Amino acid sequence: MNSLLATPPVPPHFYEHCRLSPSRSMSSTNPSGNRKRKAEDDYLPSDHDTRMSASPSNSPAFPPRPLPASRQIKRSRPNISGRPLSLSRLLETLDTDALRSVLRSMCDRHPELATEVVHTAPRPSVSSALQVLNNYQSALHSSIPLGGNSSSDYAYNRVRQHIVNLLDALSDFTPHFLPPNESQTSTALSYLDGATEILHRLPRWDTPQNNLEKDAAYEEMAKAWILVIREAGKRGGGIQLQYGGWDEKLSKHNQTAGGKLQDAVDVLSSNLGWMGTNQDLSNNQGVDASSIRQQLLSGTYGSGMPLKVGRW
């Protein structure tokens, strides 16, 4: 009875209609999904990670920047050969004496360059001129023989050329700082002060004839002092001479020179005396005016004068 009521078996042709056909998505799936995972699969990048890490090729956020010119590597020359230095590099290797020699030789060969150099070169200052004179002075003293009598004829003959060089430089620099070439009397006085000090340091020799060159230099220096003092007295009432302490400085120079600058001292004294007289007169006039004003204010003006009686 039970076997009669059992469900009859499904015919085979019904299975053919109920079977599902594979879809397109299933056919495109990765065949590796059906296989087992291996340990090395954890270290392989996925498609998602690859897409996220890759930057677009046409992204405008970070444009390519060229390397600066200083960091670009220079290509080596295929064929190297010797060549002379450029003018700028050549001048860097020359010291002061060599450069002066080159410039002097060029001016000798091309006289028209001398005028151009004179107008182009900066005007020498007092310190630079005195430095040149001090260099000649140092060369002179270093040539004096050690030991023995340093003021003998032998010592004079050893340093005579250095004396000539110093005195020649002194005679060339001094007119440059005198009026009318030098318009500032303060600059001229400053130069004369330093140049006279250098002249004092020239040695005195036992033979009087050997001292003639130094004595002649003192005479020229005295004339230079007189010229500058007279020019300074014309400007500003000679205030530069009055308040610069030049009377004391020149008096000290004259004492060191053995009285060979006395003419310059006399000219300076006359200028200061004239200015002092004018100042005393102006002071006296000021005192008289103030005295009369005080008498007028106090009502005592004319009290000491005799009273005139009768017709005026």
From Swiss-Prot:
Positions with biased composition (Basic and acidic residues): 38-51
Compositional bias (Low complexity): 21-32
Tagged with keyword Oxidoreductase: no
Chain positions covered by the region annotation Disordered: 1-82
Pfam families: Cut8
Cellular component GO terms, alphabetical: cytoplasm; nuclear membrane
Disulfide bonds: none
Gene Ontology molecular function terms on file: proteasome binding
Regions annotated as coiled coil: none
Subcellular location: Cytoplasm; Nucleus
GO biological process terms held by the UniProt record: nuclear protein quality control by the ubiquitin-proteasome system; proteasome localization; protein transport
InterPro entries: Cut8/Sts1_fam (IPR013868), Cut8/Sts1_sf (IPR038422)
Quaternary structure note: Binds the proteasome.
Summary of the function given for this chain in its UniProt record: Involved in ubiquitin-mediated protein degradation. Regulatory factor in the ubiquitin/proteasome pathway that controls the turnover of proteasome substrates. Targets proteasomes to the nucleus and facilitates the degradation of nuclear proteins.
Family, per entry: Belongs to the cut8/STS1 family.
Full protein name: Tethering factor for nuclear proteasome STS1
Organism: Ajellomyces capsulatus (strain G186AR / H82 / ATCC MYA-2454 / RMSCC 2432) (Darling's disease fungus)
